[in-house]
Structures are given as structure tokens and as C-alpha cells.
Amino acid sequence: MSELLLELFSEEIPAFMQKNAEEGYLNIFTKIFEENEIFAKVQAFAGPRRITLYATHLPKVTLPKETEIKGPSIDAPEAAINGFCKAHNVSKLELSTKLINNQLYYFFVKKTEEREIKEILPEIIIEAINKYSWAKSMFWGDYKIKWIRPLRNILCIFDGEVLPLQFGHLTANNIAYGHRYRLTDNKKLEVTDFEDYKNKLSENHVILERTKREEIIKTGLLELANSRNLNIKEDNRLIEEVAGLSEFPVVLLGKIPQKFLELPKEVLISSMRTHQKYFCLFDKEGNFAQYFLFVSNGRFANAELVIKGNEKVLSARLSDALYFYKQDIAKTLESRLGKLEAVTFHAKLGNLREKVERVAKICSYTALDNTDLITAAKLCKSDLVSEMVGEFPDLQGIMGYYYAKHEGLGEEVAAAIKDHYKPQGLSDNVPGGNAALLALADKVDSLVGLMIAGEAPTGSGDPYALRRQALGIIRIILENKLELNLNDLIIFSLKLYGNSADKDLITSFFEERAKFYFKNDYDIALINAALDLNLVDTKFKLDSLKEFLVEDAGKQLLNAYKRASNIIDGQKITGLVDASLFSTQPEKELFEVMQKISPQVTSSISDKDYNKALNLLSFLLTPITSFFDNVLVNDPDPKIAENRLSLLHNICELFDKVAKFCRL
């Protein structure tokens, strides 16, 4: 068996694209090999400057094969038959026929001769290279090929020999290159096979395997953290990213000047993790430590110089942050409200100052006399025009929290400002207390306004993430058990925009998102039966119905309802029942039970005790079964027939008070 080694050597590939490229090229090569009936073991490796493919167990030659290709029927127009022949470069005389389902079809037997594998590998490789689609790619120079970054070299060896491969301006060879910063005179590494390739890269400070680089980083982080008796929080995403920035990772320890530790910890984390790709350290009590860890791309003779350089870069960034922070705390959040007038919320919806005023009114509507909530609502966007958030946009809300605390506005106000953007996705936590009410108001105002502005999601896009916003609203209501009607809240919000025409569009949108939210736990028929925009009430109904309808009594009662509903469907019914017209015992008993339980069912619904309401409906099962078994509904006497139809109509209405049983 033979082996293939391919390396695409380029300028730096963005770290966040490397893992996808590794998996993508692996899948593409595997699939193309299988399509050509070449069954090989394929491995892929991605790094900052190279994508490598290694295939083993390759045959020397491909096996000859015959493939039967179905053509048109013999009765097809001559043009179709000629087209089939032309497509496969055969004459009509070379076609055979076969009977399929009493119809004769033309067939062509395509014969593939035995070929040496090295003859077809260049075709496969070029196809695979072109087939992978980078999220972004580029042309360079005056070359016609396109890739993520300029390609500098292609190494391609099959069984120790260079394959005759041409990709654009590049001709394949057996040359690899080591670490960019460890090369002497741009040293070329001649390789003969995969083991030789891997060893020579390692000798020249390149670790081929992404997973191995990640493991080296993890080990180095833990060792250095433990050496200072400090803790490091697990951050696999950052480890994966820095492994994509380094061909030969070395973990080093730097120190933070004491003066910067007065900054909020989120500022330190954002500066270090997001902007510098550094790892934060904490003491055993969870306090921010005066040290940080970073990954150097290579082991250098003077590690102290590398450390000092990184400390200097971090100090410069933190100096700016400290300056911005001191500038910001010199002003109150309220003093920044005027600046919000210069920030557009949406071209059709005004500015952020107007938005916070609407949000405050929605908060007043949902929670009367909650002073802390209204204060938080009016100030929740003020930090957006602060120096710090201008520099670190990911700290919106968080800086508002610290500024509110600095002003002495209290934890309730500060926490509501901090958490009012939550939840920002299905995995994000839902806020509680005043933060929940503020988050709800902010999201409702945004969603209603953007729907009015014509930004409703479509099949092709949702640029303002309104589907996610709606799910956030639904989660806030349900997880905080907020007893409010979303329909009323939508109407109130629309009034603040001076609009009422879009109510049906918005309520329908929320209903669809609520169905999407509930469908993981409940059957769609149950959801359709129970759903309204009092979502907490809907949840109670769903739980009760789900439990009730798995019982035999529940199933029988549902069947009885459906039978009654089918009988009255399409009938003109007054709904007025005259007990004096009853002539049979079953209808009398059914009427008496209905009258007895009806007020109790209504009371249970008011108390949101749907278990009790459904259990009360169960008392109808015996009399309604007897009614159907012994009473002719469509009596020859029209008055008696109408009276019995009205009785069934009233029973169905009683069921539908609990839930829309007609949808089950």
C-alpha cells in the first residue's frame, strides 16, 4: 500500500478558520477518494501557515469497473436519445435495453480501465483544493487562483516521489519550511515521506498537530499557574484560538502593575483575553491576581525580553482603560442622557434617548411604583456614550453597573442596568428581579419598533435577531413566572410608537416563537390547544393537559368531546337548553352534572388550577357516554333535537374554557 503527503503552505491563516478547514478538507478528500473507489485512511492537520493532508493504504492502481447508466425509454423523442448518446460519447448502436416496470429503457455500460493511482491523484487533489469554500478568500498578485491567504508552496509526495501537480502558478515539490522566526537563510527542508516531514518540522520548531499544540498550552498554563499557587479558569475557546496563532507554543508568565488592579475585573479580562489573547489568573479566594499568562510563538533565547514586551503592550492598553475609567466616573449617568440624542436607535425609530423614555414607560406599566426599576430604565443606555464602552463595546451594561454603584444608586439599580441585555442566546442565563423587568421592557420596545419599521425576519435573514429577541422575552416571562399578558404589553408598546396597525403581525410572530419554544417539551397539538399570550398560564395548561391526556379517562373524555363537536359542527344552535324538553334519563343526568360542575370549572380556571378543572370535566364521562349510547340526538321532533344539540354545544363550550379541545 502507498501513501500520499500534501502540504498547502501559505501566509498566516486566521486562527478561527483552521479547525473548520481541517475538518472540511478531511471530509472532501475522503468523499472524493470514495467516489473514485479509493479506500484510504485520511488525516488532516491545520496550523497557522499550513494545511496538511496525509493518506495511507492507497492502492497502486484503481480496479477496472463497469457502470450501467440508465438512459431514456425507447419511446422517448429521438432528440432525447441523441442527447444521451452525445453526453456519453457513444452511438445508438452501443446502447443496450432493459425492461423496467413493463417499459424498455436504453442503457449504456461505461467501462473504466485500470489506472495507476499516481495518474489520477493530481486530478483529485486539484478538485479537492478547489472544492473547499473558505468563509473569506482572496486573489493576490496577478495570479488567477483564489485562497484564504497567498499560497507560497505546495509539497506533494506519493511514495517518496513528487507528483506532477500544478495549481495556478505553483508547481508541487518535496520542500517544506519550518518556523518563520527560527529559519536560517530561509532554510528548505527536503522530505521523503510523512514521518520524515513530521520529524523535520518538529526539529525546526513546528508542531504539526493542532490537538498537540492545544495540549502543550493547557499543560503549560496549569504548571505556571500552580507555580504561583494561583488558579486559571478553563477557557478552551481561547486555548483553541492561540493554538491557531502559534506553530510552537510556549507559555510564559507576565506581571500586571498594581495600579491597574483598581479597574473592574471585566475591564481587565476584556483587555487581556479579548484583545491580547492572554489568560487571567486568580488567587484562591477568586480575586484577580497580579499575574497573567500568554503564549509565545516559539522558544526564544531571551524569554525575559519577550515577557517584558508583552507586559509593556498590556500596560499601554490598561493605561488607556484606567484613563477612560477615571474620566467616566467623574460624570453621572444622568448627565450623559443628552448625548443619547445623537445616537440613532433606527433610522425610522428615533434616537436612544427616545428609546429609554419608552422603556421607562413600559417598566411603569409592568411594575407600578417601582422607583429603582424606573431609575434603571432611564439610565440603562447611558454607558453607551462613555469613554470605556467606546473602547470596549463588549462591556456595555457592565460599565453601567460600576458607574451606578460609584454614584451610590444602589445594587438594585446597578444590577438591573448590568443584566438588562440578557439573555443574549439560548445558553445565556435569564435575569431576575428588576433586571428581568427592564430586560423585558427593552426587548419588547426593540422588537415592536423594528417590526413597525419593516425589519421583520424573513426566510433569508434576520439582521436584527428578532427571533432570538422574542425567545428572550418568552424565557424572561416563563422563568420569572411573570403573570402578564404579552398581548396587552404589545398593545401598550405600539401606543408609545403611535401605531396600532401592526398588532396582528407582531402577535402572530410571538405565537410562532412560543410554539417553537414549547415544542421541545410538548406535542404541537397540545401547544395549539393551550397557547395564548399569557405564557405562564399557557405553561400551566400544557403541563395539566399533558398529564391528563395520557390517562385512559383523559383519552376517553377527549373522544367524547370530539364526538359531540362533530355532531354540532355546522348546525345552527341557540345554545339555550330547556330542561322541560328532556324525555330521557341520560340527558337529564348529563345536564345536571354539567350544571353542577360548570361554576366549579370556571372558578378553577380563575385560580389557574387546570388539574382541578380537568378532573371536574371527568365527571361528565359517564353521563355523556350513557347519552351517546341511549339518546338519539337528531330526534324527529325539531325542538327536542335542537335542545339536545344545545346541550352538547354547552358541554363543548365548557371544555373550550379550559383549552381549545377542538385542536387536539
From Swiss-Prot:
Entry keyword annotation includes Methyltransferase: no
Q: Where is the signal peptide?
A: none
Which PROSITE patterns does the record cross-reference, listed alphabetically?
AA_TRNA_LIGASE_II_GLYAB
Organism domain of life = Bacteria
- Could you say which EC number(s) this protein's record lists? 6.1.1.14
Q: Where in the cell is it found?
A: Cytoplasm
Family recorded in the similarity comment: Belongs to the class-II aminoacyl-tRNA synthetase family.
Spell out the protein name for this chain: Glycine--tRNA ligase beta subunit
* Species classification: Bacteria, Pseudomonadati, Pseudomonadota, Alphaproteobacteria, Rickettsiales
